[in-house]
């Protein structure tokens, strides 16, 4: 019998429907894989075997009764940012020590309503602040990929590193993730998986721990494009509890898979050619262009002139919002509390002990740019730049471009505890150079594996679409996937 953990969601769905396997068997296969590998990979910060088996049994009963829902019996991993009722939800931060919410996030509730099974909570950068999953209170996640002939442990990307590593190492059928500046697309690119950041407002933010509220968006990481489409259909919904949720029906994304892209116009932005970009990345981009041209798409050069300002503007806007959002963690109602001589002392000691170094850095930056003397010079100017970035994309789309193709990341995965990056936070921030524009403009973006670099590590291509045209991204990404093939890490763990 095939190893059940090697099945895609679509394949598992077919076998469950045909009663060739049961949801309990599938869930047990994943729980066994987690038990064997998690000590090494560190993808999960909490595993919920009893809950998983109980949900799988209920799925088997519904399948037997002919009442199977869209994700019936499919075992998923949930990023630790999503509120899961009565289960560890700590945003991988010490300050939320012991926190178990009394509510369920809208996205996870949608998944459970569609019959999905929860395997546990996935590791991530603390409060989703990071590009390498090294800022987690629970330690770094190891990428299931290694360079040819090397034993060096690599990062899986961030902040959704646990989600990407778990999918790549087959420790779940698919995973939820979030993306504020690239936190779905960059880890997907580093691990040879598919990740989509939907349009801002497509998935509810209710019950998801906030980082930067005007940028945060939930989405799936999956093994292939079809699985990502299946997951997004279940995750997305209109939600009156989230004021930024957009009242548009959720299409059947899976129906877009396999559609022709003949006649589509694909924009290639000249500003994405950055100094020092590895030859492998440039070659992959050219290969992606050739694949889409061969499939009948028209390739057009475009300009997004304000791209160069996106990263500095992002690292003003996001920390400013984080500084406001994270002010609520004070040790009074929940999470960690460090006693002090008075309430102010208690606040200071709790926050000093509870937040990690990178989170403290971003709170400090955010508080600084919002302070009276600097608000106009930094925050207001960054918001104006954001408007210009959005306008660049609008003009490109108005000129007839259907989607935009770029590299997903400026490099392949790098080593854990890389000294060069550890000593210079700005170098780490540069990992987001190709992804932040999409969040600043609120657009959908998908990362799809395009090939391996000369070290044998996966590289991703990014497609950027018009607002709420995720179907265009899925059908175009599927063309790339068909041409490039799928990539699986050789097991060393």
Curated annotation (Swiss-Prot):
Specify the domain of life of the species encoding this protein.
Bacteria
List the active-site residues.
79, 159, 183
Keywords carried by this UniProt record:
ATP-binding, Ligase, Nucleotide-binding, Protein biosynthesis
Give a GO biological-process term. Answer: translation
Keyword Cytoplasm appears in the UniProt entry: no
Keyword Disulfide bond set for record: no
Single annotated GO MF: glutaminyl-tRNA synthase (glutamine-hydrolyzing) activity
Concerning Pfam families, the annotation shows:
Amidase
EC number per UniProt: 6.3.5.7
- Alphabetized PROSITE patterns for the sequence: AMIDASES (PS00571)
Q: Name one GO cellular component term.
A: glutamyl-tRNA(Gln) amidotransferase complex
Its catalytic activity? L-glutamyl-tRNA(Gln) + L-glutamine + ATP + H2O = L-glutaminyl-tRNA(Gln) + L-glutamate + ADP + phosphate + H(+)
Report the top EC class in one word.
ligase
Family designation: Belongs to the amidase family. GatA subfamily.
State the oligomer form and interacting partners: Heterotrimer of A, B and C subunits.
Biological function: Allows the formation of correctly charged Gln-tRNA(Gln) through the transamidation of misacylated Glu-tRNA(Gln) in organisms which lack glutaminyl-tRNA synthetase. The reaction takes place in the presence of glutamine and ATP through an activated gamma-phospho-Glu-tRNA(Gln).
Question: Which PANTHER family does this UniProt record tie to the protein?
Answer: GLUTAMYL-TRNA(GLN) AMIDOTRANSFERASE SUBUNIT A (PTHR11895:SF151), TRANSAMIDASE (PTHR11895)
Protein name (Swiss-Prot/TrEMBL)? Glutamyl-tRNA(Gln) amidotransferase subunit A
Organism of origin is: Rhizobium meliloti (strain 1021)
> By which gene is this protein encoded?
gatA
């Amino acid at each position: 019998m095939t190893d059940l953990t090697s099945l895609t969601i679509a394949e598992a769905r077919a076998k469950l429907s045909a009663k060739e396997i049961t949801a309990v068997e599938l869930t047990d296969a994943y729980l066994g894989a987690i038990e064997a590998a998690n000590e090494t990979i560190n993808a999960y910060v909490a595993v919920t075997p009893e809950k998983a088996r109980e949900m799988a049994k209920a799925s088997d009963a519904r399948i037997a009764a002919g009442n199977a829902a869209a994700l019936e019996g499919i075992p998923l991993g949930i990023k630790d940012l999503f509120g899961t009722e009565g289960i560890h939800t700590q945003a991988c931060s010490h300050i939320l020590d012991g926190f178990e919410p009394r509510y369920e996030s809208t996205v996870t509730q949608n998944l459970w309503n569609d019959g999905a099974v929860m395997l546990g909570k996935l590791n991530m950068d603390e409060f989703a602040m990071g590009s390498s999953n090294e800022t987690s209170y629970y330690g770094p996640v190891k990428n299931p990929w290694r360079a040819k002939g090397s034993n060096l442990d690599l990062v899986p990307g961030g902040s959704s590193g646990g989600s990407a590593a778990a999918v790549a190492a087959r420790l779940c059928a698919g995973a939820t993730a979030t993306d504020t500046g690239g936190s779905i697309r960059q880890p997907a690119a580093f691990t040879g998986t598919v990740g989509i950041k939907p349009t801002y407002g497509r998935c509810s933010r209710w019950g998801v721990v906030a980082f930067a509220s005007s940028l945060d968006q939930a989405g799936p990481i999956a093994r292939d494009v079809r699985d990502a489409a299946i997951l997004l259909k279940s995750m997305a919904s209109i939600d009156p509890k989230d004021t930024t949720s957009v009242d548009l029906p959720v299409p059947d994304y899976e129906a877009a898979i396999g559609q022709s892209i003949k006649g589509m116009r694909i924009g290639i932005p000249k500003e994405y050619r950055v100094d020092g970009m590895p030859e492998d990345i440039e070659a992959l981009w050219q290969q992606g262009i050739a694949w889409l041209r061969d499939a009948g798409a028209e390739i057009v050069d475009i300009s997004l002139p304000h791209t160069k300002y996106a990263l500095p503007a992002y690292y003003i806007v996001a920390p400013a919002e984080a500084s406001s959002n994270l002010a609520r963690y004070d040790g009074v109602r929940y999470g960690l509390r460090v006693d002090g001589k008075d309430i102010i002392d208690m606040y200071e000691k709790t926050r000093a002990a509870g937040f990690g170094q990178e989170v403290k850095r971003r709170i400090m930056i955010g508080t600084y740019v919002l302070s009276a003397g600097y608000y106009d010079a930094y925050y207001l100017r960054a918001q104006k730049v954001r408007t210009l970035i959005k306008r660049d994309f609008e003009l490109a789309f108005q000129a007839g471009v259907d989607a935009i193709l770029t590299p997903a990341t400026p490099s392949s995965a790098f080593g854990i505890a890389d000294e060069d990056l550890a000593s210079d936070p700005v170098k780490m921030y540069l990992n987001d150079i190709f992804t932040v524009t999409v969040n600043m403009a609120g657009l959908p973006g998908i990362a799809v594996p395009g090939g391996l670099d000369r070290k044998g590590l996966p590289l991703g291509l990014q497609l950027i679409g018009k607002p709420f045209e995720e179907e265009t991204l899925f059908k175009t990404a599927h063309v790339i996937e068909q041409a490039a093939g799928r990539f699986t890490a050789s097991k060393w763990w």
